[in-house]
Each structure stands twice: as structure tokens, then as C-alpha cells.
Amino acid sequence: MRGRICFLAIVILCSFSFILVRSLNEEGRVLLEFKAFLNDSNGYLASWNQLDSNPCNWTGIACTHLRTVTSVDLNGMNLSGTLSPLICKLHGLRKLNVSTNFISGPIPQDLSLCRSLEVLDLCTNRFHGVIPIQLTMIITLKKLYLCENYLFGSIPRQIGNLSSLQELVIYSNNLTGVIPPSMAKLRQLRIIRAGRNGFSGVIPSEISGCESLKVLGLAENLLEGSLPKQLEKLQNLTDLILWQNRLSGEIPPSVGNISRLEVLALHENYFTGSIPREIGKLTKMKRLYLYTNQLTGEIPREIGNLIDAAEIDFSENQLTGFIPKEFGHILNLKLLHLFENILLGPIPRELGELTLLEKLDLSINRLNGTIPQELQFLPYLVDLQLFDNQLEGKIPPLIGFYSNFSVLDMSANSLSGPIPAHFCRFQTLILLSLGSNKLSGNIPRDLKTCKSLTKLMLGDNQLTGSLPIELFNLQNLTALELHQNWLSGNISADLGKLKNLERLRLANNNFTGEIPPEIGNLTKIVGFNISSNQLTGHIPKELGSCVTIQRLDLSGNKFSGYIAQELGQLVYLEILRLSDNRLTGEIPHSFGDLTRLMELQLGGNLLSENIPVELGKLTSLQISLNISHNNLSGTIPDSLGNLQMLEILYLNDNKLSGEIPASIGNLMSLLICNISNNNLVGTVPDTAVFQRMDSSNFAGNHGLCNSQRSHCQPLVPHSDSKLNWLINGSQRQKILTITCIVIGSVFLITFLGLCWTIKRREPAFVALEDQTKPDVMDSYYFPKKGFTYQGLVDATRNFSEDVVLGRGACGTVYKAEMSGGEVIAVKKLNSRGEGASSDNSFRAEISTLGKIRHRNIVKLYGFCYHQNSNLLLYEYMSKGSLGEQLQRGEKNCLLDWNARYRIALGAAEGLCYLHHDCRPQIVHRDIKSNNILLDERFQAHVGDFGLAKLIDLSYSKSMSAVAGSYGYIAPEYAYTMKVTEKCDIYSFGVVLLELITGKPPVQPLEQGGDLVNWVRRSIRNMIPTIEMFDARLDTNDKRTVHEMSLVLKIALFCTSNSPASRPTMREVVAMITEARGSSSLSSSSITSETPLEEANSSKEI
């Protein structure tokens, strides 16, 4: 028995000893504590096992032979959470790298306890706050990387204490203040990369004390003053990168003494004077960028000494004189850009010696002479742009035979002769632009092999012959411009093969025959102009299939017959010109559906019947409504008074009768209103609009008189000749139209054009009665709470205007006081007659709102579909929308900063719920202040999901609808046409700017056109932050100003031009919460704490 006990004791002792041996050492436990503050969503740190004896084999850990941890490298592991200073318990730690993760929070001050640290890399995370002064106590530090975070404040002036520092990389933050002169103490510093911040002041001359400096990168800041001459002391400097600042003065000749310089990037500043000849002493120069300054004078011939240069860009200056032939000595040159200067003389044939040249752009100058034959032998030339000069003669015949072109643009010159045949020999040509020259002959059939071509622009020449059938094999063509030539023949049915075509211009030629019905295959076409030809026949109804078209011009031909009703399906049309043809019949009533139309030209035809009252629905008409010189009869519809933006109205030379509607006299935008030569009676309405117009606009109506005269007498016509219209009237009215557009329409055209050019095709209508599809009618068809359709009619007084709460793109919202005393909001969606978007909105909104519940989301009580009425029943918000509240005057605005802060946080939480907690994820698509509704306590509720997009909803018909409202639309949508949650975040950032500034999202054109640009411009112009804040707010409270400044930063994060740089909504909620929780005031001004422009990723900072 005793022996057994002894044996058992030995076993237990051995087991205990084994455990002691296998237990994790102190450094391993420190790392596990450090890991506890991180979220390892991808499991990269799964090898960090507490059962190991030491951490030396763990992922990202490096040790000495004595198993002491010296390096923690967690780069790119998708980690989030916060950075714990517990890591400094690793006393042998020399390197800490957590870059390219999602770690947030401030940089811990206690990192200063890492006394042996040599490398600290926190780049590309979500760190915010200031750079802790305590970091300057780590005197062993050699490399400090803090780039691509959200740090603000200034560089600690104690930075000079880091005597061992070799590399300081802090670009892409929101740092401000001056470059501290104490950096002169950093004798071992080799690299400074501090671009894309908000540093101001001058470049300190003391920086010349950094005698080891090789790279000085301060691009994209707000630095001012001249370039310090003391920089010549930096004899080790290879890269001087100062682009996009506010530097001015002349480039000092002393820059030529920095003998090792390889990169000199001074572009996008305000440098004046000439390019110093001493720049030719920089014989090691590789890249020289001086573009977008105000440089004058001639390019020095000494430029030819830069024999190792690969890229030289002097574009967008005011340089004069000849292009130096010495450029031909730089045999390594790959890029030469001299465009947009005032350069004269011929193109030097010596450029033909640059056999490595890839890109040559000499456009927008005053160059003359011929194109040197030598250029056609450059084997690596891919981009040649010579447009907008005074070049003449023939294009070299072998151009393209030896060169692998992708872009070739020689437009806007005086080139003559035939088009050479070898442009696309290597099948890489993407753009060929030879327009606005004097080229003659036929379009070369050799282009039939150019499958790569996307843009072919040969307009405004003297080309003859017919359209080569081979052109229609170029399936990648998106733009075909052959206007204003002498081309003839029929339009081939093969035109329909170009299914990627977006722009087709065939105007001002001699084409005959009919437009082939295959034109309907061009379903991506945006602009189609075939005006001023000899085309006959009917306008093909198949044009109604070109649903993306925005500009259609068929004027000045010989088209006859009725106008196809199908043209009313082109709901994206902005400009429709059918004038000067032989069209008969009535104006299609379906034209009332073209609600985006800005210009409608139907004059000079044989149209008859009445003017459709539906034209009054074209409330976007602005440029012109011209239905003159036809055979129209009946009265002028009173509905034309709805065209509140219209500037030019031509109704003259018809057979119209009755009186002039008083509503037209109230169109304050009207510049021209010609209703002469009709059968109108009565008096001209005595309004300011008509008072400023000449009486000739009303002449030729024998029963019409001017009310301003004491004795009302008929107005005498100036001319009633239809022939006068056909000969010169059309041109005269066009001239008047253009003049008025220039004077009165620049801003509004830009405003509407920017908004509508980014809109996409609406889907075909799908009947709501179809209940076979899930998530559409099954769950929510019957309204909740016992509401009936008749009850809703009674509660809204038959949808009276008196109870209208608001109007939107999808419908009108009414206040409904139900018989039981409950108040709700009823949204009546637009009828099908206004397009399918209403029913798509109905379906998407139900599918979305019916499934979610959140305190900051507007509740959907139910919906009702009755005959053709689609009704949504919402929770009533007594305080209306945020937009309405912000638009009130100073005395009526009920929103102090505390209320605005709570609204910002509540709306952020609602949007965060949609993005992160709904399955599938919901993207709102139309976040704006008018869609953030307020209850009686001013609590925010996100509403109006008429444009909502469920990422995975198979049956949602709103997926290709336009995303957002003008002023709120993310910039990337214009070219990607894709909607992501980042678009919502951009829009929400605009809402935050509205809350802070009190300004609407759309600003005058001279101020940038939208609120984001206005704020960015104010910051760049050093406007004090407090002057950007809403004047109705109390800015005497420091805490309030501090919170507003922080929310302004958040807004600028959200409205970053790069979607990848925008935070998630969870991060936005966290930042807004932290803004109020912050206890200390920032000492720096926000005026320059935010990067406002994204740099090209290929450029160094």
C-alpha cells in the first residue's frame, strides 16, 4: 500500500513538473494580453497558443536565440480593435508593425515605455487623435511610420529629440501647423514623407540641417512662400516632392546645385518667372515635373543636359518661344508633356531621335508647320496628342506603321490630304481623333481591322464617299463622330451592330434614304445627332428602344408622317429636336412622360391638332419649347404655366385661338415668348414678363391687343410669311436661342446636366398585381391597424392639397387624421402614367421597410393598393424633415447644436442598422436632409426608401434606378454607375455638412457647385472654421465649437473622393459618439486638418 502511494506521488510530481516546463513564459502572456484588445476576424493569430512554452513560433513574432521577443509584425492581417501599450512589457522589442489593418482609437501615450523600439509602423489604420508627445521620448527610434490614418494636430516640436530617427513617414493624415524647425537636429534623417496633410506656413530653411536627407516629400499641403535657397545644402537629396501646395516666387537657380537630385516635383503650385538654366546641371534627373504653375519665358536649351531623364512635364504654364531641339539629346525620355502653353514654331524633327518615347503631348499651343516625318518611326510611341495647334500639311503616311498607338489625337489643326491607313496596325488603338481639320478622301477601309477602337472622331473635315460597311464591325466603338463632312449614301442597317455605341454624330452631311429600324439595337446610345441631311421616310418607332438616350436631334431633314408615340418612352431624354422636317399629325401625348426634357424643338413641320395639355408636365424644360410654324389649332393650354424654368417659348405661326393664359405671364424665367401670327384674342396679360417683351412677339393676332395701351388696338404683324421661316427664320431663332442660353442658362444647365447625366435606365414596368413573386405581396398586402382605402380618402380629404406634407420624386406625402384620432402619414406614389419608377419604388419600399424595426427608422404601418393608387402608410413625424428645419430663418429655426448633434447621431445609427444589421444588407441610395424625419422630440428617423436597394433582393426593380439626389451623389457613381454603402456614407457626410453650416447641398457655381466643394474651398483658402459654421448657432461655447469641429472632420472623412477612404457607418457612429465624449479642446484649427484631394496613387508624396 505504501509503495502504491509513493508511486502515485511520483506520477503527480512528474506531471506537475511537466506542466511547469510547458507553461507559457512571461513574454507570451504579455502578447496574449496584447491580443485581447484586437479582433482577429480572419484567425491569423490562431497560432498564439497559451499551451506553448514561448511565443517564438507564433505568427508575426521574431525572437533572439535566447527566445527574447524582438519583433511583432502583424501587417495586413485584417485586425481591428485598439492598440494596447502592454506590448511595451516586451523589454527587448525593437520592431512593432501593425500596418494595413483596421485598428482604431488614439495612439497610446504609454508606447513611450517601449525603450528599445527602433521601428514603429502604424500606417494604414484608423488611428485618430494627435501624435503623442511621449513618442519623442523613444530615443532609440529609427523609423516612425504613421501614414494613412486620421491623425490631427501638429508635429510635436520635440521631434528633434529623436536623434536616431532615419525615416519619418506621416503622409495622408489631417495634420496641421508648421514644419517644426527642430527637425534640423535630426542629422541622421534620410526620409521625410509628410504629404497629403494640411501643413501651412513656409518650408523652414532649418531643414537644410538634415544633412543626410535623401527624400523630402511635402506634397498636397498648404505650404506657402518661396523655395528656400538653403535646400542646396542637402547634397544627398534625391527626391524633392512639393507638388500641390501654395508655393510661389521664382524657382531659385540654386536648385541646380542639388547635384544628386533625381526627382523634382514642383507641379500644381504658383511658381512664376522662367525655368532656370541651372536646372540643366541636374544630370542625374529622372523625373522633372513643373506643370500647372505660372511659368513664363522660353524653355532653356540646357534642358538637353538631362540625359538620364525619363519624364519631363512642363504643361499648363505660359511658356513661350520654340520647343528646344536639345530635347532630342535626352535619349532615355519616355514622357514629354508640353501641352497648354504658348509655344510657337515647328515641332523639332530632333524629337524623332527619342526612340524610347512613349507619350508625347504638345497640344493646345501655337505650333505650326508640318508634322515631322521622323515621328512616324518611334517604335514605343503609344500616346501622341497634337490637337489644337496650327499644324498643316499631310499626316505622315507611315504613322502607326511602327508605333503601337493607343491614343492618337491631331484634331483642331489645318491638316489636309487623306487619312493614312496604318493607324491601327498593332490592334491597340483606342482613340483616334482627327476632327476639325481639312482632311479629304474616303474613310479608310483599313479601320475595319481595328477591333480595339472605342472612339473614332473624324467630324468637321472634307471626307467624301459613303460609310464603309467595315466600320460596323468595330464592336467596341462607344463614340462615332463623322459630322460636318461631305459623306453621302444610305445609312446601313449594319449600324445596329454597334451595340456599345453611346455617341453617334452624323449631322451636316448628305446622307439619304431612311434611318434603318436596326437603330433600335443601340440600347446604350446617349447622344444621336443626324440633323441637316437629306433623310426621308418615317422616324422609326424602333428609336423607342434606345431607352438610355439623352440627346436626339433629327432636325433639318425630310422626315414625314406621324411622330412615333414610342418616342415618349425615352424617359431620359434631355434634348429632342425634330424641327424643319415634314412631320404631320398631332404632337404625341406621350411626350408628357419626358419629364427630364430641357429642350423640345418641333418647329417648321406640318403638325396639326391641339397642343397636348401633357406638355405642361415637362417641368424641366428650360432651354426652349419651340412648336412654331406648324398648323396647330385650339387654345394654348393653361398647363404650360407649369413650366417654371422655361426661358424661350415659340408658339408663333400656327392657328391657335382663344386668349393667352394668364399662367404663362407668370413664368418669370421667360426671356422670349413669341406667339405672333395666330388667331388669338383678348388682351396680353399685364405681367412683368410680357411688359419687357417687344410687341412684335404678339403681332399678327387680329383679335389681340396690348393691355398697356389706353385704347386697345390690334397689334400689327411684322411678317406672316411661312416662307420667311423656311428661309431664314430657323437660323435667326437659333441665334437668339444660343444668345439667351449663354446669358441666362449657364448655371442651371450645368446644375441639371450634372444631375441627369449620371442617371441610368429605368427598368420595364412589372404589374403589382403579379403576386407570384415572394417578398412583394405575400406579407404586407393588407394594411395594418384596420385602415381602409375609404378611411384614408376621408382622412386626407380626398388627398387635398391642404394636407400635403411634402413631395418627392416618387410621390406626394399627405397628413391623415384617422377617425380614431390617430395621425399617420400617407405617401401616394405617382401613377403608372409617369413611368414605372413609382411601382418599382412601391415594391422596393415595401420589401425593405416591412421587414425592419429600429428606433431611428420610420415605421411602415402598412400599404394599400386600390385600382391605380399605391399608398404607403407611415408613422407621422410632427416636426417634418431635417431639410425643412434647416431652411427656416434665424428666428424660426428650432435646432440648436445639441439638437443637431442628436439628429446626426440618430440618423447615423439608423443608417448603421441598415448597413450592418439587416440581412440582406440594405443600401438606402437617397440619403439627404429631406429624408431624415423628426418626431415631436426632434429624434431622427431615416425614411423614404423609394430608391432603396436590397443587395440580394432578386425581384427588386429599383436596382438600376438613379442613386440619390443632386448635391448628395458620390463622385464615383458618375463613372461606375454602381451603388454601394460607400455612396450612402458620402451622402450622409453631406447631411453632416448641412447640419454644421446650415447651407443647402447645392451652392452657386462660382463657389464650387455643391456644399462639399464649398467647404473644401473654404478650408484651402484658410477661412477660419468658425466662419463656416451656421450663424444661427451659438459659437461662444468652446465645447460646442469643439464638437462641431470634430463633426466637420467626420463629414470630410465621409465625403472623401475615394470610397476606400470613407469610414463604415459603424465607425461613423463611434466617431460621432467620441466627439461628444471628448473632454479636451483641440488646440489646432480645423481649417487645414483634413486632406481634401486624393493624390494619384502613382505619385509619390
Curated annotation (Swiss-Prot):
Gene3D superfamilies: Phosphorylase Kinase, domain 1, Ribonuclease Inhibitor, Transferase(Phosphotransferase) domain 1
Signal sequence range: 1-23
Organism: Arabidopsis thaliana (Mouse-ear cress)
Pfam families for this protein: LRR_1, LRR_8, LRRNT_2, Pkinase
Protein name: Leucine-rich repeat receptor-like serine/threonine-protein kinase At1g17230
Active site: D926 (proton acceptor)
Phosphotyrosine PTM sites in chain numbering: Y874, Y913, Y968, Y975
Residue positions, PTM Phosphoserine: S960
